[in-house]
Amino acid sequence: MAITATQNDGVSLNANKISYDLVETDVEIITSGRRSIPAHSGILASVSPVLTNIIEKPRKIHGGSSKKVIKILGVPCDAVSVFVRFLYSPSVTENEMEKYGIHLLALSHVYMVTQLKQRCTKGVGERVTAENVVDILQLARLCDAPDLCLKCMRFIHYKFKTVEQTEGWKFLQEHDPFLELDILQFIDDAESRKKRRRRHRREQNLYLQLSEAMECIEHICTEGCTLVGPSSNLDNKSTCQAKPGPCSAFSTCYGLQLLIRHFAVCKKRVDGKGCVRCKRMIQLLRLHSSICDQSESCRVPLCRQYKNRGEKDKKMVEDTKWKVLVRRVASAKAMSSLSQSKKKKSEVLFKEEAEDLIRIRNKLM
């Protein structure tokens, strides 16, 4: 039921299930503007442990009144009224959050009102701008609001050129150099992470391309494609008489076929030494040999020779890099095969379900 717990501030307080309209207020909250807000100690103590400690202290009598006096100073009177009303009925309007969000955040932290602090953290975070982000960040650090701190840091990172032109940033540079250093360090770390992610994506794309190239080499040497087939001899110009149509990875496969044709007829190719294109082909064949697990029956040229030779690089650093490359390409190939297998299985299941539905429909007709 509704209760009347204010006299001059015009803020009505609501309580659910319990009626306090017949209970006399025993606490008087005084604001900076000397506004008096009557309240019930039972309500205040049930929500805020800080107010509980204040209420339990020996009572001081003021002007013959037996009410406990609690002073909440340093914030607007209306903000205190909204704060007290929240203790009775946990609700804050958008307009109140717009006007008193930062004040309510400070009050919720000081008086340990967790529910209000969570709402203020979210509400204030939604209202961050280039002009107020520095002030909100400082308040968030004082109020131990890590989520709001992180949001402000990210905002400054994304719009740093705009933020550094504001008065808040200039004030920060003059009066809080340690916070400025923390912000710049956060921006530097974020940029470093972004560069690492970009490099990782480029590397993953490279491994996927090499994995696709390995599959295309096996496809060319086993099944054949438009230009080169399994009956081709890399040491002469002969090609398959029957040429199949383009495969699903034709863009990669076509380039490899041209590379294989060149490798077969290049006059500079002598014991692995030759032009750049020949060296590239040798590297691809060597990479295939390193990840191939069927070298005895493999139809890719030089696969068995490279496997048996077990060649070693002259430098250990190069050998280590090569091993890492082989391992990651093999992993990318395995993941690609797994995804393709799942896709094929789903297509088969979908086809079977469709056939079952057609069969059932035909029976019903």
Swiss-Prot record:
Chain positions covered by the region annotation CaM-binding: 315-338
Cited Pfam families: BTB (PF00651), zf-TAZ (PF02135)
Span(s) of short sequence motif Nuclear localization signal: 193-202
Molecular function terms from GO: calmodulin binding; zinc ion binding
Tissue expression: Preferentially expressed in young leaves, roots and stems.
Lineage top rank: taxon: Eukaryota
Compartments where found: Nucleus; Cytoplasm
GO cellular component, one term: nucleus
Major localization class: nucleus
Gene induction: Up-regulated by auxin (IAA). Down-regulated by salicylic acid (SA) and hydrogen peroxide.
Alphabetical UniProt keywords: Cytoplasm, Metal-binding, Nucleus, Ubl conjugation pathway, Zinc, Zinc-finger
BTB domain residues: 25-96
Pathway in which this enzyme or protein is active: Protein modification; protein ubiquitination
Zn-finger region bounds: TAZ-type: 205-304
GO biological process: embryo sac development; pollen development; protein ubiquitination; regulation of DNA-templated transcription; response to auxin; response to hydrogen peroxide; response to salicylic acid
Notes on the domains: The BTB/POZ domain mediates the interaction with some component of ubiquitin ligase complexes.
Subunit: Interacts with CUL3A. Interacts with GTE9/BET9 and GTE11/BET10 through the BTB domain.
Function: May act as a substrate-specific adapter of an E3 ubiquitin-protein ligase complex (CUL3-RBX1-BTB) which mediates the ubiquitination and subsequent proteasomal degradation of target proteins. Also targeted for degradation by the 26S proteasome pathway. May be involved in gametophyte development.
PANTHER family assigned: BTB/POZ AND TAZ DOMAIN-CONTAINING PROTEIN 3-RELATED, BTB_POZ AND TAZ DOMAIN-CONTAINING PROTEIN 1
Protein name in UniProt: BTB/POZ and TAZ domain-containing protein 1
Organism: Arabidopsis thaliana (Mouse-ear cress)
Lineage of the species this protein comes from: Eukaryota, Viridiplantae, Streptophyta, Embryophyta, Tracheophyta
Gene encoding the protein: BT1
